[in-house]
Amino acid sequence: LAFDVSTRGSYNMMQAAVTHSINRVINTGPHFVLAGRTYETFDYELNPDIPPQPGTNLYALSKSLGQEICKVFTEGNDVHVLCYLFYSFRDPNQPLVGADLTPFSISWNDAAEAFRLGLEVKLSNLPSRCEIFNIFTDLPHQQFSNEKAKSLLGFSPQDTLSQWWHK
Protein backbone atom coordinates (compact mmCIF):
# COMPACT_ATOMS: atom_id res chain seq x y z
CA LEU A 1 0.00 0.00 0.00
CA ALA A 2 2.82 2.45 0.82
CA PHE A 3 4.32 2.12 -2.65
CA ASP A 4 0.92 2.36 -4.36
CA VAL A 5 0.04 5.57 -2.56
CA SER A 6 3.37 7.34 -2.13
CA THR A 7 5.46 6.16 -5.07
CA ARG A 8 2.96 5.29 -7.77
CA GLY A 9 0.77 8.16 -6.58
CA SER A 10 3.63 10.61 -7.17
CA TYR A 11 4.14 9.21 -10.66
CA ASN A 12 0.43 9.52 -11.47
CA MET A 13 0.31 13.07 -10.05
CA MET A 14 3.28 14.19 -12.13
CA GLN A 15 2.01 12.46 -15.27
CA ALA A 16 -1.33 14.25 -14.83
CA ALA A 17 0.45 17.59 -14.32
CA VAL A 18 2.42 17.14 -17.55
CA THR A 19 -0.60 15.88 -19.51
CA HIS A 20 -2.75 18.83 -18.40
CA SER A 21 0.01 21.48 -18.63
CA ILE A 22 0.02 22.21 -14.91
CA ASN A 23 3.26 24.06 -14.27
CA ARG A 24 3.30 24.10 -10.45
CA VAL A 25 2.87 21.18 -8.06
CA ILE A 26 3.20 21.31 -4.29
CA ASN A 27 4.04 17.86 -3.04
CA THR A 28 4.22 17.00 0.65
CA GLY A 29 6.01 14.44 2.71
CA PRO A 30 7.41 13.72 6.14
CA HIS A 31 10.77 15.15 7.12
CA PHE A 32 12.34 11.72 7.00
CA VAL A 33 12.05 11.71 3.20
CA LEU A 34 15.50 13.28 3.57
CA ALA A 35 16.55 12.85 7.17
CA GLY A 36 16.04 9.36 8.50
CA ARG A 37 17.40 8.11 11.79
CA THR A 38 21.03 8.25 10.65
CA TYR A 39 20.83 12.02 10.27
CA GLU A 40 18.23 12.74 12.89
CA THR A 41 20.15 11.10 15.70
CA PHE A 42 23.51 12.77 15.18
CA ASP A 43 23.26 16.01 13.21
CA TYR A 44 21.97 19.58 13.61
CA GLU A 45 21.06 22.39 11.21
CA LEU A 46 19.68 19.78 8.81
CA ASN A 47 18.52 21.61 5.70
CA PRO A 48 16.42 20.40 2.77
CA ASP A 49 19.42 20.24 0.42
CA ILE A 50 21.23 17.45 2.27
CA PRO A 51 21.71 14.16 0.39
CA PRO A 52 18.60 12.05 1.08
CA GLN A 53 18.94 9.26 3.62
CA PRO A 54 15.41 8.15 4.52
CA GLY A 55 16.57 5.09 6.42
CA THR A 56 14.81 1.73 6.22
CA ASN A 57 11.27 2.73 7.18
CA LEU A 58 8.92 1.59 4.38
CA TYR A 59 6.82 4.76 4.45
CA ALA A 60 9.91 7.00 4.38
CA LEU A 61 11.41 5.01 1.50
CA SER A 62 8.22 5.11 -0.56
CA LYS A 63 7.86 8.88 0.00
CA SER A 64 11.53 9.41 -0.85
CA LEU A 65 11.10 7.49 -4.11
CA GLY A 66 8.03 9.61 -4.83
CA GLN A 67 10.11 12.75 -4.30
CA GLU A 68 12.73 11.44 -6.72
CA ILE A 69 10.00 10.77 -9.30
CA CYS A 70 8.86 14.38 -8.93
CA LYS A 71 12.41 15.59 -9.47
CA VAL A 72 12.89 13.45 -12.60
CA PHE A 73 9.66 14.82 -14.11
CA THR A 74 10.91 18.39 -13.66
CA GLU A 75 14.07 17.64 -15.61
CA GLY A 76 12.34 16.99 -18.93
CA ASN A 77 9.05 18.83 -18.62
CA ASP A 78 7.73 22.33 -18.07
CA VAL A 79 6.70 21.71 -14.47
CA HIS A 80 8.00 22.97 -11.12
CA VAL A 81 7.67 20.98 -7.91
CA LEU A 82 7.83 22.50 -4.46
CA CYS A 83 8.11 19.71 -1.92
CA TYR A 84 7.06 20.64 1.61
CA LEU A 85 8.40 18.45 4.39
CA PHE A 86 6.29 18.30 7.55
CA TYR A 87 6.13 16.18 10.67
CA SER A 88 3.89 17.43 13.47
CA PHE A 89 0.91 19.77 13.16
CA ARG A 90 -0.19 21.54 16.34
CA ASP A 91 -3.05 23.71 17.49
CA PRO A 92 -1.32 26.39 19.59
CA ASN A 93 -4.44 26.66 21.77
CA GLN A 94 -4.43 22.99 22.76
CA PRO A 95 -2.32 21.81 25.69
CA LEU A 96 0.46 19.35 24.94
CA VAL A 97 -0.11 16.70 27.57
CA GLY A 98 2.25 13.80 28.25
CA ALA A 99 4.63 14.49 25.36
CA ASP A 100 7.34 16.85 24.25
CA LEU A 101 7.19 19.08 21.22
CA THR A 102 8.86 17.46 18.23
CA PRO A 103 11.58 19.45 16.44
CA PHE A 104 9.55 19.70 13.23
CA SER A 105 6.31 21.17 14.63
CA ILE A 106 4.08 23.78 13.03
CA SER A 107 0.65 25.25 13.62
CA TRP A 108 -2.11 24.52 11.15
CA ASN A 109 -2.34 28.23 10.26
CA ASP A 110 1.37 28.55 9.52
CA ALA A 111 1.25 25.39 7.39
CA ALA A 112 -1.64 26.85 5.39
CA GLU A 113 0.32 30.08 4.89
CA ALA A 114 3.24 28.09 3.45
CA PHE A 115 0.88 26.75 0.77
CA ARG A 116 -0.33 30.23 -0.10
CA LEU A 117 3.27 31.37 -0.46
CA GLY A 118 4.10 28.37 -2.65
CA LEU A 119 1.20 29.13 -4.95
CA GLU A 120 2.24 32.77 -5.27
CA VAL A 121 6.05 32.54 -5.51
CA LYS A 122 7.45 33.55 -8.88
CA LEU A 123 8.77 30.28 -10.32
CA SER A 124 11.64 32.02 -12.09
CA ASN A 125 12.96 33.08 -8.66
CA LEU A 126 13.52 29.47 -7.61
CA PRO A 127 17.01 27.99 -8.10
CA SER A 128 15.65 24.90 -9.89
CA ARG A 129 12.42 23.28 -11.06
CA CYS A 130 12.40 21.01 -8.00
CA GLU A 131 12.92 22.57 -4.59
CA ILE A 132 12.45 20.97 -1.19
CA PHE A 133 11.48 23.01 1.87
CA ASN A 134 11.44 22.22 5.59
CA ILE A 135 8.20 23.69 6.91
CA PHE A 136 8.03 24.23 10.67
CA THR A 137 8.02 27.02 13.21
CA ASP A 138 11.18 28.62 14.56
CA LEU A 139 12.44 26.43 17.38
CA PRO A 140 15.47 27.07 19.61
CA HIS A 141 17.24 23.71 19.34
CA GLN A 142 18.08 24.18 15.63
CA GLN A 143 18.13 20.49 14.82
CA PHE A 144 16.57 21.35 11.46
CA SER A 145 16.69 24.53 9.39
CA ASN A 146 13.75 26.31 7.78
CA GLU A 147 15.91 29.13 6.36
CA LYS A 148 15.35 28.06 2.76
CA ALA A 149 11.57 28.43 3.13
CA LYS A 150 12.11 31.85 4.65
CA SER A 151 14.49 33.11 1.98
CA LEU A 152 12.83 31.69 -1.15
CA LEU A 153 9.15 31.68 -0.17
CA GLY A 154 9.06 34.54 2.34
CA PHE A 155 7.84 32.08 4.99
CA SER A 156 7.55 33.67 8.42
CA PRO A 157 5.86 31.42 10.99
CA GLN A 158 3.62 33.35 13.37
CA ASP A 159 2.86 30.68 15.97
CA THR A 160 6.04 30.10 17.98
CA LEU A 161 4.60 27.20 20.01
CA SER A 162 6.88 28.52 22.75
CA GLN A 163 4.45 27.45 25.46
CA TRP A 164 5.66 23.89 24.81
CA TRP A 165 9.40 24.45 24.74
CA HIS A 166 9.53 27.21 27.37
CA LYS A 167 9.00 25.02 30.41
Segments from the language model and where they lie:
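Alpha-helical substrate-binding/gating segment
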Residues: 71, 86-92, 105-129
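Glycine-rich "substrate-gating" loop/helix at the edge of Rossmann-like oxidoreductase active sites
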Residues: 55-59, 97-108, 123
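Catalytic helix-loop patch of NAD(P)-dependent Rossmann-fold dehydrogenases
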Residues: 4, 40-75
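Amphipathic terminal alpha-helices
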Residues: 161-167
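Conserved Rossmann-fold NAD(P)-dependent oxidoreductase catalytic core, especially the SDR/UDP-sugar
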Residues: 12-53
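Conserved beta-loop-beta element that borders a ligand/cofactor-binding pocket
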Residues: 29-30, 67-92
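Conserved C-terminal active-site "lid" loop/helix of NAD(P)H-dependent oxidoreductases
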Residues: 130-156
